[in-house]
Structures are given as structure tokens and as C-alpha cells.
Amino acid sequence: MKIFWPMKKLIVVLWVCSFATAFAQNHAINQQKLANIRQAEQSVVVLNNSGGYLPVKNMEGLKVANVHAGFDFAPVFDSIANKYSTVTSFNTDGITGTEAFNALHDKLKLYNLIVFTISGHTRFTPAFLAFVNDVAALHQVVFVLAGDGKNLTRLDKIQAPAIYYPNNTSEGASIAAQVIFGGVGATAKLAAGYSPGFKQGSGYTTTKIRLGYSVPEAVAVNSDRLAGIDSLIKAGIAAHAAPSVVVLLAKDGQVIFQKAYGKHTYDGTEVTQPDDIFDMASVTKVTATTPAIMRLYDQKAINIDSPISKYIALVRDAPDKRDVKIKEALLHEAGFTPYIKFYEQLKPTDMSRDSSAAYPTKVADGYYLRANYFNEVMWPVTLKSEGHTRGKFVYSDISMYMMKEVVEEVTHTKLNDFVNAEFYRPLGLQATGFLPRNRFDKIRIVPTTENDNWFRNMLVQGYVNDPGSAMAGGVEGHAGLFANANDLAIFYQMLLNQGVYGGKTYFNPGTVKTFTSRQSKVSHRGYGYDRRADKREPGDYCSEQAFGHSGYTGTYVWVDPQYNLVYIFLSNKTYPDDGKTFGVSKINLRPKVLDMYYKAIVDGRAVVEKK
């Protein structure tokens, strides 16, 4: 989020305080906050929405600017809006003359949604009113007005959606931002009339189409029951299970807990933030590669009962692989070897410290691999690799190397480009994707190892930790994806919704059920997705419907349709020494946090039933 404020430092402090309050772990405080939230939800009115623009449907290519004009809770509004789209904020405080407003107008030229936030005490000077009219004539505009409704009369002749709520509170600002993007639906009508365009009883009904953001009490979860998560994770960090952790909990379509712990490194100064970006490791399998296969299955572009060799010609020359079906690979029953140490094939001439046409593949800072290394070395080694007994469950990264090749052969598109176009951009995901250093400053990306002992022998930050994926250029079917917790919550809420999110259908419900249900006769697995194996993984309380996956770097995503929940756990357990640090796994930190989440839900249900 970019902020253009006269008092930027103060605003940032206020934003942090507002965020902390929104997710307070105190039942008494949150009960009062919930009462305020409910009041705001019941009073927010959507006006001038005959065209149905609200809630915003199309997130792809959306560039949002918030223009705050005397708005009292701008930091709260911005923090929530940024959950849905990257937002740049401007403030009109101190701007008075026409020339200054014209300069601000010029700064808005690259944005295609301008949100004006206005309070009842905002002064509509002639220069400001002219500015508002000029912007509304050239851009899609949404007005948000809090407090006294008299300023609605100033907007009477502007045909643009408006959101009004009478109580000028932080909760109202949060709800207004969520109404814009569909995290909350609106049903209220104006209690009084203000002008011919805003008559008493005016108001449009809008629907909830995306995740909302609230307190645990909003879904009958007692915040006090979640307080132990802090203790668990802080103890884990102290035991060097991982230096950096982010946990997100969502239930009933509401994110009710999102918190960051620790620092990027044990001895560093970079404090972990809730929106930090982590290496997904094997969570790539179920957030990129398997969904790509699901899309092709939906479109009948592939048949999972067909052999892989139908789609990949070179597999026809591999006797032990030519008859393997796609579904066998997805179930890890193809007989493939678990993994291949490709780095053991490296020769000094394969690597360079400088980039060139001969060495284009960047695997770390100052480390490049020669051109065509995957096609000339890695892929032939994969095809010739010895296997295991077909039909037996052997978890294998090679399965997803194969699935990536299937996707690219059928779509004629690179896997990273395909999932960006089909899922990540339409969903409004801001951080999810491969090759994050091409898009983000590395300070936003949590490092995975201080000294990669496999082959790079240096800090790995923003480059995929997995050696095979790194050597393949950072885009592979088993690893290479990076994401943050909020993005993952959106993606897995879409799956929990049976393939629907934001008013758009990404999968047929039957496809989601087919891939996430148990499909194996010899294991607990679905097609690509992991499922409950025992009480240790993913925890003691999850239902038989639950599905998800874990990642080697310390990542964890689980969805439980029976409890209507999403659980995201991100960490860098491989830091500082990949291959020797497995604390998160050894102390079962990820399942323990999930168990605490389930207990809080069950306790909440008991209280509701008792009442």
C-alpha cells in the first residue's frame, strides 16, 4: 500500500494500532467490538447502484486509489481495502486551490477506480467540488460518506455508486471498505431524505461474494480460546523451530485471526509482517499444478484416466512410464522415485557468476545456470529414473514435474503464466506467483536458508528453496510458488465455496469434490490433495472431509468443509540450515495450532447450543 499523507509517520502508527485492535485476543473487548460491527452492518446504505457496479466484480487489472477528504478513519479503511486490492492512498488535507487539486487529479490518471471517502464535516469548497466532478467524469468513482448525511446533497448530480453510514466509527469504515469488494453485503435504506437523488427509503441490496474480516466472536469463537496460539508459536520460535511465522484462520467466510510472529531471521531486525511472502514448497502442488490440471479436466481438455504419454511424446520412450495414467501421478501411485538430486549432476561449466545468453537461468544472487539445462540434463534424467512398484503409495515430486509438462503441452502456455491468468489475477491475489524477485523487493520475502548446502552455498531469499525447481528456472510443478497468507485464504475459500469466488466460477463443484475427496484404495489421498492420514496430521479434530497440503519450508494449508474453515500456517523452518532444521515438524507445531483452532470452534458451538 502506498500512502501520500502530510503526516505519514503518524498515520502508519495509527494503522498498526487499528489493525491490532481489529484482531484483539480479548473476548470482552471483541464482544463490544462485535456489537459495533453489527450496528455498522445494519446501517450501511448503498446508493446509486442501479448498474450493479457494487460489489466490484472484476479484480483483474484493477488499480485503486483512495482519496480521503477529512475522513476520520482513513487508516482503517485503507488496511481493509488492501486485503482485496493493492491500494494507493491520497489525502486532500491542506489542499485548497484549484491548481493543487489539478495536480492531484494528474496523479490519479493511471487508476481505474477512485474511492472518495468523506465525513459529514468535510468542507465542499468550490475547488474541491470541481475536482470531484472532474474526476468522476473520467474515472469509475465510488463515494463513501460517514456521519451527517448532509453532504450527500453535494453528490446529487454525480451518477456514481455511494456508500453512506450514519455512525462515524472505525467499524463503519471497515464495513464500508468490505461492502465495496463484497466482503459484506448491504441491505439498509436511508432513514431520512437529503435530496431528490437521495430520498428516504433509498438503498440497494448487495451481496457477500468474497472473504470478510472480523473478530472471532462474529463466528461464535471466543477470542480467549485462541490466545494460546501466541504461546505455542513463541515457544516454537524460542526452540528454533522457525524464526518467522504467520497464522491465518478463517471461518464461515470471515478471516477472524491473522497474526505474524518473530523475525525473518533469528538474529536479524526485519520483523515478520502479516502480508510477508513465503516460499510455498510443496503447497505449490495444490495451489498451482493441481488446480491447473483441474481446469483442464473441467474443460475436458485432458482425461485423467489417460496415460501421461498421450500428452508428452518423450514419455512414450520410457518403458516404465509410458502407461502411467495422470490420476496415478496425482495419487502418487505411479511408481516414480520420490525425488532426484539433480544438483549432483552439476559440472563447473554448468554454472556462472554472471548472466549472459549462455547462462540465463538465475538460481540465486550472482549464480546462473547454463541455457537449456532442464531439457538437456534434468528432463532426460527424469525420464530414465528408476521407479518403485506401481500402484503403491510413494510420495513423489516427479509426479508434479510430469503434471507441469502436461499442463504446458495442452495449453501451450508456461505453468506460471497459465495459473496467473486463470486464477491469481482474476481472484485479486496480490503476492501469489512464481519468480517473486521479478515483482517484489526481497525485503518482503522471507528467506528460507542462510546457507544452501545443496549447491548454492549462500543465502536464499526470494529464489525457490527446492534445488530441482531452482535449476529448472524457478517454475516447477512441485515447488516454486510464493504467496502470503491472505492470498492463500482467498484461494482456499474459493475451493471451500466449491469453485466459486467473487461472483466468478473457477471450477465446477463436481470437479472440486472429485479432486479433494479420497480417491485412492491404498492411501488417504485425493487427486493432488492430501487428506487426513492419522491424528498427528493434520490434527486430532479435523473431519473426514478435510483436505490440504504441507510444504517442506514449513507451510501448511487445510480446508475443512464440515467446519467451514480455512487454516493457513506459514513459516521458514528451513532457516538457517536447510537439511538440519525440522523443528516445526518435530514439535508438531502446525497441527497443534490447528487443534487449538478446532477446540475454540467446538467450544463456541457448545455455548451457542446451550443458549
Locate predicted features.
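Bacterial Sec-dependent N-terminal signal peptides
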Residues: M1-H27
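Coil residues (strongly favoring Ser/Thr
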Residues: V12-V13, A24, S79, K107, ...
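Preference for extracellular/luminal or secreted protein segments
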Residues: A24-N222
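Short, conserved catalytic-motif segment at the N-terminal edge
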Residues: A218-M280, A301-N303, E537, D578-G579
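Short active-site loop at a secondary-structure junction
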Residues: A239-V246, G268-E328, E386-S399, E476-A479
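Short, surface-exposed loop or secondary-structure junction motifs
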Residues: P319-Q545
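Short, surface-exposed beta-strand/loop micro-motifs that present aromatic residues
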Residues: A546, T553-I568
